[in-house]
Amino acid sequence: MDSDGVSHAPSVAQSAPSWNPALRHEKDHAPAATAKLPSQVKPESSSEEESEEEEEEEDDDEDDEEEEDSDEDDDEEENAPAATAVSGPTPIAVLDGAQDSEDESESPSELTKSTPIVQASQGSMEKRVEVIGAEEEALVNAAQALNISGNPATGQTKAESTDEAESDEDSEEEESSDEEAAAAGEHQADNYEHQGEATALEEAVNESVRVPLVDDAAPESDDWGDSGDPFEIGGLQQDPSLQTPHAEAAGTTVGDDVIGNTTVGGNAGDDLDWGNTEEEDFFGVVANKPVESVEPAQPTQSPGAHVVQAQDAAPAKSEWDLDLDLDEDFLPDNEDGPVIELSDDEGFLDDEPTAPVEQPASTGIGGASRYAPQAAQTSHSVASPYAAPGQFANPPQGSMTRSITTPAGGVYNGYGQNVAYQQQQAARPTMPTSAQSYADKSKGGYASPYDLPDDVVTTRKRTTPRPVISATQPAIPPPRTSSMSSSSAPPRPLPPSNASVASLSPPPSGHSMQGQMTGFPPAVPPKSAPPAKAPSSDFFAELPVTSKPKPPGRYTPQPAAAAQSPSLQGPPQFTQKERTASWSSLRNEVLPDTVGAQPHLRQPEQLPMFPSQPSVPTRQNSLPIPQSTAPPPSSRYSPAPPSVPANNARYSPAPPTAQGGANSRYSPAPPGSQGAAHARYVSEPPTGPARTPSQTYAPRTSSPLAFHSTPHHQENTTNVSEQQLPGHHVTQSADGVPRAPFRSPLEGVSEALELDSTSSDRPPTTARSDTPPPTRSSTSSAIGSPRKKGNYTPQYQPMNPMAPSRSLSQSPATGMKQPGPMYGAAPIAASYGTHIQEATTTNSIPHRRQASLNYECIVPEDERAVDPLQRYKGHPVFAWGLGGTIVTTFPKQIPRYGGGMTAPMVKCSPGEIKIQSVKEIIPLAEDLAKFPGPLKAKSKKKDVLSWLTKRLESLELQIKDPNTEHTLSVDELKRLEEKTLLLKLLQFLVENDGRLEGEAANAAFKNLFSPEADNASDAEGSFSTAADIVGRSRSNTVNTPAEPIDARAIEDLQKMLARGEREKAVWHAVDQRLWGHAMLLSSTLSKDIWKQVVQEFVRNEVKKVGRSNQALAVLYEVFAGNHEDCIDELVPASARAGFQMVSTDGAGAALNAQQGLDKWRETIALILNNRSEGDVSALLSLGKLLSQYGRVEAAHICFILGRSVAHVSGVDDALADLVLIGIDHKQHPTELGVDLEPILLTEVYEFALSLSAQVNSHIMPHLQNYKLAHAYQLAEHGYRTEAQAYCDAIAAAMKATTRTSPYYNLSFIASLDDLSKRLSQSPKDSSSSWISKPSMDRVSTSLMSKFNSFIAGEDDGPSSNAATGTEVGPFAKITGDSPGLTPSHSNADLYADCFCKFKICSFKYIRTKDVIRATEIALRAAGQTFYGVERQPPPQPQLSPPSQRTQAKMQSYSPLRAEHNVSQPSYGNPYMPTPPNEETASASSFGGYQPQQGTGHSFDDPAPPTSSFDEPSYQPYNPDADDMEEDNKPKKKSIMDDDDDDLVARAAALKIGSGSNSKSDADKKADEAFRKAAEADAKRDKENAAKKAGGGWLSGWFKKDPNAAPGPIKAKLGEESSFYYDPDLGKWVNKKGGSSEPERATATPPPPKGPPMGARSASGGMPPPSGPPPSGAGLMKPPTSAPLRSSSMPPPMGLPGSRSSTPGLPSDNEGGPKPPTLARPSFGAASGPPSRPGTGMSNASSIDDLLGAPQARKGAGAKKKKGGRYVDVFPQGQAS
């Protein structure tokens, strides 16, 4: 169209199917698809036709087109005085001759610039005008048809406002068009560039065989929604009727470089006027056509840039549609992909700054001229998600309104390039004056005025029917667009008209809110932006040259997509005036309005598939664009929701950004995308289409799908959150894709932030209801009773470091609802969503991760190259070491440079291996590490007090710290103070030995709970300053004057009493407020009446006097005995139920129900200082109340004070009031044991109670489990010694009580035993080696002594044996002290060899069956029982079953420990109690398993006893084998053996000899005489041997050899003369022995290897009563039950206290048959057993004997003779 208003579109008739969606839509919707363009249309006729078209359009889409037409008509009238004002959208019609004459001057230049296609001479302007008029009519018809299909509502906006805006814009556009025309006239040829190949745009404009304009009949009405593409969906319903770009927008200089005034379609005629007049924009005219009804068609209207073509075609809508048949491919492409907003840039629409954008009235998108800026809409205009906001028209308004010039491609030009983006990128010249020739703009590629509409059309095509959206009430985007995250979001109102002078010019990129690139006049005055738009010399210069493929699909990124990306996302919503030309420079950061308009339709941002094609250039502007209003976060994908509040979107369809993610067909923007959407374009300048790749590697985030993982809720966060995240805050990939805010890999995810994203809408939890938080198990209710959820004042914030670690424990909202971190304190912000929001709202550039220097690794040439784990690249290694050590190693990366390499390559090699202590790497808190636990004895009292004092000091310092008030909430401060009180109470409890009674206790209570009591009287006396009365509640005394006493009331009372109605008299006194009478009378009645009277008194006389008397009221209730209900005086039941407390007396505002809670200290002080019966129950009730409100520390103080009624138990006990001090087990049951401090405080409480215990220490069974957890943590942090001490303390506690506890279950015992084993086998804290380093000074002393005690034992002689019997034994000492000496069970080994042939493995592996078999074999092999009675096979099998049971028990725990550790039961759980108390010491180490081996072997050869000790892990005692040989060879007896045997034989002879007369008295005397001599010799030898043995185990061994030689000789001598076989005894007896040395039997050095072991196993297990006397007789009996027990029960547990009753473990007693089994029936006479075995048995019965016995045995064993003598006695006796 010329500036005169004449439109020249000769090529329009020839153009291929119109690329204009509006036209195409007309085709689709037009009833007649074959409408033909009238060959000639006179201006008059055009006006008439326009009027007709207006009428038709009014019928179809009156609202939309009326608005547009009215706007354009106004513009045309203003721009073309000669032209008849078209009342309807007819402005496209042929202009009058006057207009022609006026515009011709400008048109030539413009036509040459913009449309080379139009080649008619300027002289024939009139002819062109006629043709153009016809085309315009056709366009008008098409537009009308489009408007018919469009939503009529779009034109609802009043035409007056649009007309005003259009008039202003027209005036401006005319000026610009005149200038452009002049410029074009001067250098038309220069500006024109011939393109060898016709572009899609040209084909769309020019008729071609492939896409004939007229031949191809389009459906009468295009169903843009049929495709299902966002393009179709886009804004058809939502978009208000597109207001035809008025002359305001005419001459759009799209970036002045991009499209400028270029006539799309290739019309080159200079006479073509592109919007200089009111009709500048075809769409303006078309859109205004519905306004025809408002204004008569004016054929003379100056056509807008688009209108130029439409004017000629106006005669027939259908024909025009056919003539302008949109390229079928082109339109579908637009549908497929978001239309690139090739909106006429400033150049196109702005060419004619016909009227400055001043039409605020046109705020309504529909009614107002599209170009008329609408103030309300500027900030709020919601971009239609379905249509890209056109610069020339509001995309929401109807796609049909698109100017003819807009290609169907919409924002994308025929080359698939995003014109809108280009336009934005190019700084727009001032809209009013810029009128560059289209030729200039086509240097990058020829672009005609049609090209510009092409950009615009794309969006409109989809949005054909667009509802009119008033700025105030943006239309809700149609839900159908998947791209729109929130269909419900109100459309953004058009930007205010005042935005720029060129109101009609398409909004510059600066007006991101408007769809500037759509080609439609933005609702906002586009001209202001044009100046900002840097003129680009070539329209296509910025776009990468590509084949002009139409966008394959709305989603297919176009080369211009990158450019479009800014358009996709509008800059932060600004009023148009806010947007300045300067913003155009930020076009990369600003999204064109198309974003809002076409979120649904717009083609996804052209993100390069590879970094080589980054869609977004690196941000050039570091500063984020100010976000006066959040820009619609048009995501790079059409569906991206507008980042700005949807309601601000210029186009109604714009979805709210928050929801956009969810609804958008594209993956949701990154979490920060709320702001990211705009952020990407605003803060992150999108790269130009030609952006060169900046990265060689394309991050996965560049993929649109990379953001699917982003939760939609983040986008759904409030608009605040969107605004909070300015685009510049969001990091972007090379492609410009917004990334989630960078987080360090080690950075912990802030729960508060995540909660905020989901719950930013949620009101801050700080609002507290008076209802206490519900217990964790209870469901929350609206009422918020203590069990119901509600925000309540005592919200517990774990932020308080001193508070229990559990976070949110007291927060009613967070603690109950939010899954806040259960362990560890959560940041306060986590509790309160508002804090999070505030943090996010702040404009702060987040840390941008620096480019990491990750170089490629040199790939090895061997098989390592195919390693799927790529270990050759090196990886850090971390491992936990022994004894709390950490082993780490990090690979070394050595850079290697090569020729031609820009960056070095790295070769990894193993790094240094570091061994560090956990204490250094992960140190345990000092206060926890220095805790003096375990607290076993009273000696720890001082240490405990010291620890509590330090803890209190740290708390007090924290309270005094001025920062504490700022970092902690009021509730947290209260809890911190209460925690201090709790520690003080515990400190006093320890100091006072656990007693809370007495004067000291009363004084302490006064100091703790009423420190101000002493000063209270002084303070009450007078108030020197106003500050003194602060905090004092107002007294209501004035309102409750004392009532006078009524004499008649007294008389009535007397009468009632006279009648005997005492109760009635009481209530009468109450009614008359005769409280004294009432209480006196009620005291004589039942307790219930007394309570009720007191309640009434408190309610009427105490509480009403003042609001601070709750504590006194509670005390009175306590006196009355209302222990349960007294707490109602602090917090009424109604308040606990969640009801608001209102002042009934009207004296003040509503009461704070929790105000009474703060009176708990006063209440406790009153109760404790005025003790009454049952007041502890009141303390318990108060504690429960405080616990309900999360005041854990205060509640536990009450429980401690009322400990007599408080129930302390485990968390599984529903009735438990206290589990661990300092933590609420009801609301946070799973947190118990996680934080050590509550465990330590509870240990202190237990210790304090134990101080007051008269008998045993006070033990809390449930606490032992937590102690074990404490031990584990200590072990984990490298405190092995302390952990081991805890294990021992727990074991002792279990054995200390005879009462069984469910907490001592199998799982607990197994865990304890497992930890104990680990600790015993791990190195000590001082050394990391397996064996602790011995100090040099002890090498000669300590080491040798240990060897002596460990290997040999120092018991050569009977005296030494006796001594050893009382000692604990080497095993207990060595095993406990030196974990490195694992073979502590070597004792057993020393004697096990005798039976080792049967015992293949340690008892752990030998099951009872094996033992039985072995014993039986041994018995058979022996063919005789050594020591006769003692070893009988029968007992063995009998014992085996019980042993199996016991063994099974023991095995499960720690079978091995017995081996090395005598002190600890190795097999039986060391902690399992063993019933026999006597032998616990002895059995503890070996007894656990002795039953198995002992039971089987104890009666067999001496070997079984050895086996009872399990196979010797340290050193099997070979002498056992020798002993076996000795058994076979009785001759090998030493004198000592003979002596021992003699002693035993003499004892037996004394018992039996009296009855036996086998020999004569003379013989006896001779034998005795001879025997005495022999004994004397033997005694001397024995003494010498003992002396030698005393030297050490080595000496014992050496001594053994010398003894061996004389031994046999002496034994033979003695045997020959004195020994005889006694059939009664069944053994050989020494006649001479008599009772000569009976005492030596008791002092027998070592118990016999075989029998002693058996005896030991048997006797060790059996209780002392069952134990046999030193003589062997007793041995037979003991085996019954004793051995079984010893074997089954771990020795330490052997004590009855820890007896087998431990849960889960069958007691040894279970095997009832065991005693009979153990009983040795074969022994016959109890006295019969040989004396030596008897003594051995007796010695073995105790732990000391076991320990000592092995030592003695060791010595004896070292001497084989000793071992042999025991064995030899029998064979020799038998032989003899």
Swiss-Prot record:
Signal sequence segment: none
Swiss-Prot/TrEMBL keywords: Autophagy, Endoplasmic reticulum, ER-Golgi transport, Membrane, Protein transport, Transport
Comp. bias intervals (Basic and acidic residues): 187-196, 1560-1586
Gene Ontology cellular-component annotations: endoplasmic reticulum exit site; endoplasmic reticulum membrane; ER to Golgi transport vesicle membrane
Biological processes annotated in GO: autophagy; Golgi organization; intracellular transport; protein localization to endoplasmic reticulum exit site; protein transport; vesicle-mediated transport
Gene3D superfamilies listed in its UniProt record: 1.25.40.1030
Keyword match Endoplasmic reticulum: yes
Top-level taxon: Eukaryota
Region entry Disordered, spans: 1-129, 143-277, 292-817, 1428-1776
Compositionally skewed regions (Pro residues) per UniProt: 522-533, 629-644, 1662-1671
Ranges annotated as biased composition (Acidic residues): 46-79, 162-181, 217-226, 321-353
InterPro entries xrefs: Sec16_CCD, Sec16_Sec23-bd
Compartment annotation: Endoplasmic reticulum membrane
Regions of compositional bias (Polar residues) in chain numbering: 111-124, 144-158, 394-406, 415-439, 612-627, 692-704, 716-734, 1445-1454, 1477-1496
Endoplasmic reticulum recorded as keyword: yes
Pfam family of the protein (one): TPR_Sec16
Function recorded in the entry: Involved in the initiation of assembly of the COPII coat required for the formation of transport vesicles from the endoplasmic reticulum (ER) and the selection of cargo molecules. Also involved in autophagy.
This protein's name: COPII coat assembly protein SEC16
Originating organism: Phaeosphaeria nodorum (strain SN15 / ATCC MYA-4574 / FGSC 10173) (Glume blotch fungus)
Gene name of the record: SEC16
